[in-house]
Amino acid sequence: MISKPDKNKLRLKRHKRIRGKISGTAERPRLSVFRSNKNIYAQLIDDVEGVTLASASTNDKNISAEGSKMEQAAEVGKALAETAAKKNIKSVVFDRSGYLYHGRIQALADAARENGLEF
């Protein structure tokens, strides 16, 4: 009998492999993305100190709950880029957390790039 692999287990395996190769600093923090069925979360992390420098999610009050999930992801990317600009962060390392680079992950990344983050 053919068994179907668990998608989340494969994602976590990819995430561990990615995290072994990338790390964020205060000058160039890691932009980590988490995607659930309803929401999307993004944060800028300094791995040297182990602190979150900035964050944004669809649960924030300033991000509209209207529109599609793709539009909401783009709003999160824009909000995170604006917060980063206020803290003089221009360049980041993108951590897609094992998710494939398309859909909501790509929309968030593109919006962050359009609003001033470099990666």
Swiss-Prot record:
Q: Does the keyword Iron apply?
A: no
What's this protein's name?
Large ribosomal subunit protein uL18
Q: Which family does it belong to?
A: Belongs to the universal ribosomal protein uL18 family.
Example GO molecular function: 5S rRNA binding
Q: Which PANTHER family has this protein been placed in? A: 39S RIBOSOMAL PROTEIN L18, MITOCHONDRIAL, LARGE RIBOSOMAL SUBUNIT PROTEIN UL18M
Q: Does the keyword Ribonucleoprotein apply?
A: yes
Which keywords annotate this record? Ribonucleoprotein, Ribosomal protein, RNA-binding, rRNA-binding
